[in-house]
């Protein structure tokens, strides 16, 4: 079966992370978020996967290659061009990306799945496909009910009692929302839908293709199915995704490394004296990291590979990226540390009394010389 992963966006809402990596490559429990999707698609028989890429495309293409490591075939549709030896990203919209692939080689010749490359799911895709076929719809959206106070964060789907979609609301206020069913970014299309998408034009699935499907009066269904859905739309979602997954709240996802103490996992060759530190799980400490005596770590916290936490540092409910150093005055809570950056869940820099974050750095630069 065939699927498409949408991976061409710039990820502006998760900056500054996406200055250095495309959004689908952001690590969750040490693994790119898109890798969870590829694994899940493979489990449900989707063995031919096209990925549209644009922003920092080589990072995605270089990591996933042709897909054989996951038992699938992966191909890429690059949205952009080369100018003066520099790659210029020019995304054409989510629906435009589908049209571009189809116009090039006619890839979509049967029912196909489209998923956003920035979410982790455990949805029974096989069951959802069956519901789509049974309904006879030309297009289906997988929806999920969310608490009413969360509705303004999503695109709302309004449907009748049979599941036929009637209208959409884009991030309505709590009072204006006509439904608590939201668009999860998981779509099933018949190839005929592609005829509605204009050629060589930036065209979006949610804001342009879906209204067109409604206008044409085509069978358009919402499929509600129970599943865990961790959407990484913004930095706060990314932080929450790590928190939830470290607590084991997504089926089929296991912590990497070795569980050396209850709810504490490590990679290889970690330097730590357990009698001289305070660590309360769930916590992961990456390979070749050094945790000095006097450090406090409270979970859920992820410490990446090659990190250096100096005596006196305190880390709580945070994500510390690979090769980060936190100095003795560093107190990090509900935050993300990477390079010389330390930001809260909203991407705001955490202030330092001295003005500069001299307690955050690259561990490879400031690691003390080996004795």
Task: Go through each PLM region and give its residues.
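Conserved beta-loop-beta/alpha segment of the NTase-like Rossmann-fold superfamily
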Residues: 61, 69-161, 196
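Long terminal segments
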Residues: 341-371
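Extended, small-residue-rich solenoid/repeat segments and analogous flexible loops
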Residues: 215-300
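Short internal beta-strands
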Residues: 50-54, 142-143, 336
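N-terminal glycine-rich phosphate-binding loop and ensuing alpha1 helix
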Residues: 1-62, 72
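A structural signal for short hydrophobic beta-strand segments in well-ordered beta-sheet cores
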Residues: 25, 157-159, 222
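A structural motif detector for beta-strand N-caps
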Residues: 258, 264, 269-277, 283, ...
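Catalytic-core segments of class I nucleotidyltransferases/pyrophosphorylases
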Residues: 111-113, 120, 126-133, 146-149, ...
């Amino acid at each position: 079966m065939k699927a498409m992963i949408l991976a061409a966006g710039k990820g502006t809402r998760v900056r500054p992370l996406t200055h250095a990596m495309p959004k689908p490559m952001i690590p969750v429990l040490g693994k790119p978020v898109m890798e969870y999707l590829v694994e899940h698609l493979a489990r449900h028989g989707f063995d031919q996967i096209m990925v549209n890429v644009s922003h920092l495309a080589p990072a995605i293409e270089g990591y996933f290659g042709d897909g054989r490591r996951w038992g699938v075939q992966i191909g890429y549709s690059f949205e952009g061009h080369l100018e003066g030896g520099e790659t210029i990203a020019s995304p054409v919209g989510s629906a435009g990306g589908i049209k571009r692939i189809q116009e090039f080689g006619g890839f979509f010749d049967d029912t196909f799945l489209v998923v956003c490359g920035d979410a982790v799911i455990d949805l029974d895709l096989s069951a959802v496909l069956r519901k789509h076929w049974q309904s006879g719809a030309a297009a289906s959206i997988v929806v999920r009910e969310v608490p009413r106070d969360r509705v303004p964060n999503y695109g709302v789907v309004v449907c009748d009692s049979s599941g036929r979609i009637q209208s959409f609301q884009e991030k309505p206020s709590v009072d204006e929302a006509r439904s608590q069913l939201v668009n999860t970014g998981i779509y099933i299309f018949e190839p005929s839908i592609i005829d509605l998408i204009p050629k060589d034009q930036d065209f979006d699935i949610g804001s342009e293709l879906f209204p067109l499907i409604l206008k044409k009066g085509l069978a358009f269904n919402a499929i509600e199915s129970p599943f865990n859905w961790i959407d990484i739309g913004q930095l706060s979602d990314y932080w929450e995704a790590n928190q939830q997954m470290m607590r084991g709240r997504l089926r089929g996802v296991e912590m990497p490394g070795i569980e050396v103490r209850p709810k504490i996992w490590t990679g290889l060759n970690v330097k730590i004296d357990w009698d001289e530190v305070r660590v309360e799980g769930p916590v992961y400490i990456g390979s070749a990291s050094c945790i000095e005596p006097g450090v406090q770590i409270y979970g859920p916290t992820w410490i990446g590979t090659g990190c250096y936490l100096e005596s006196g540092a305190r880390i709580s409910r945070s994500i510390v990226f690979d090769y980060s150093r936190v100095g003795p005055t560093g107190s990090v809570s509900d935050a993300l540390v990477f390079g010389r950056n330390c930001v809260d869940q909203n991407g705001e820099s955490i202030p330092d009394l001295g003005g500069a974050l001299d307690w955050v750095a690259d561990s490879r630069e400031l690691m003390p010389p080996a004795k």
